[in-house]
């Protein structure tokens, strides 16, 4: 599994509600989200979650017409990070990630990996 993960908002919220957010830190060396995801999440983040702005907004802008802003920013950041894993559950976002060659996992898959 990759050492870096980029997370979408819904996955952060789910793991937080289950009190399992710590799993990300146990499985990955770097956990990154975008400022858009931080805003959607709306909670204080732990220090080990890095907020990283997307540098090249081209993919994010293109994706926003089909998927949520947070998901679009997560995919764009995953493109920039390279060799990372993206955690997302939305089907449209998963299809976009697949088309762009990005490896992803869902929240359920992440829980299975943590087991």
Which residues are covered by each model-predicted region?
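Active-site-proximal, substrate-binding regions of enzyme catalytic domains
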Residues: 2-84, 91, 100-103
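Short alpha-helix plus adjacent loop in nuclease-associated cores
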Residues: 108-115
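Short glycine-/small-residue-rich flexible loop motifs, especially phosphate/cofactor-binding loops
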Residues: 75, 94, 111
């Amino acid at each position: 599994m990759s050492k870096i993960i980029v997370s979408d908002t819904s996955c952060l919220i789910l793991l937080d509600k289950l009190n399992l957010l710590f799993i990300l830190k146990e499985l990955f060396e770097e956990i990154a989200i975008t400022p858009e995801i931080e805003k959607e999440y709306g909670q204080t983040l732990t220090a080990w979650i890095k907020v990283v702005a997307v540098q090249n907004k081209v993919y994010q802008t293109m994706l926003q017409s089909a998927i949520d802003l947070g998901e679009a920013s997560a995919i764009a950041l995953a493109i920039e990070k390279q060799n990372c894993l993206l955690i997302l559950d939305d089907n449209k976002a998963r299809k976009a990630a697949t088309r762009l060659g990005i490896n992803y996992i869902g929240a359920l898959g992440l829980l299975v990996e943590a087991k």
